[in-house]
């Protein structure tokens, strides 16, 4: 069962921030290549995003997997919706969909 404090923390994080990356490490120091790739993509697009390091809290990490029904990290959320992990973000970036999504839904990227 999901810990109540973790559920509230997750919901609050994705509600208060237009773009949130739950990742291993931080945007300044990613602790895995997959997290680093997503950070690099968001930085290339010039998007401000909130990063949450999942390495220091095992219960948060496990509860986030249940919350999102996604087994791995990083997990990118835009406007409260899970976009996906590294492979999906990379594919969306390469085909231009991620930039369009960020322009249309968050207005974080200007035309």
UniProtKB/Swiss-Prot annotation:
PANTHER family noted in UniProt: GLUTAREDOXIN FAMILY MEMBER, GLUTAREDOXIN-RELATED PROTEIN 5, MITOCHONDRIAL
Protein's name according to its UniProt entry: Probable monothiol glutaredoxin 2
Domain Glutaredoxin, chain residue ranges per copy: 7-109
Binding residues for [2Fe-2S] cluster: 32
The UniProt record lists the keyword Ion transport: no
Alphabetical UniProt keywords: 2Fe-2S, Iron, Iron-sulfur, Metal-binding, Redox-active center
NCBIfam families: Grx4 family monothiol glutaredoxin
Matches recorded under InterPro entries: Glutaredoxin, GRX_PICOT-like, Monothiol_GRX, Monothiol_GRX-rel, Thioredoxin-like_sf
Superkingdom, taxonomy of origin: Bacteria
Gene symbol of the encoding locus: grxC2
Disulfide bonds: none
Recorded GO MF terms: 2 iron, 2 sulfur cluster binding; disulfide oxidoreductase activity; metal ion binding
Binding, glutathione: 24, 61, 73, 86-87
Sequence similarity: Belongs to the glutaredoxin family. Monothiol subfamily.
Pfam families associated with the record: Glutaredoxin
């Amino acid at each position: 069962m999901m810990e109540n404090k973790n559920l509230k923390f997750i919901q609050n994080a994705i509600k208060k921030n237009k773009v949130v990356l739950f990742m291993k490490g931080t945007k300044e120091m990613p602790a895995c290549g997959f997290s680093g790739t997503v950070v690099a993509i968001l930085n290339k697009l010039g998007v401000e995003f909130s990063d949450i390091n999942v390495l220091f809290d095992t219960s948060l990490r496990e509860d986030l997997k249940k919350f999102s029904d996604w087994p791995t990290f990083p997990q990118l959320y835009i406007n409260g919706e899970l976009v996906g992990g590294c492979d999906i973000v990379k594919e969306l970036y390469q085909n231009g969909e991620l930039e369009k999504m960020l322009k249309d839904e968050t207005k974080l990227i200007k035309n």
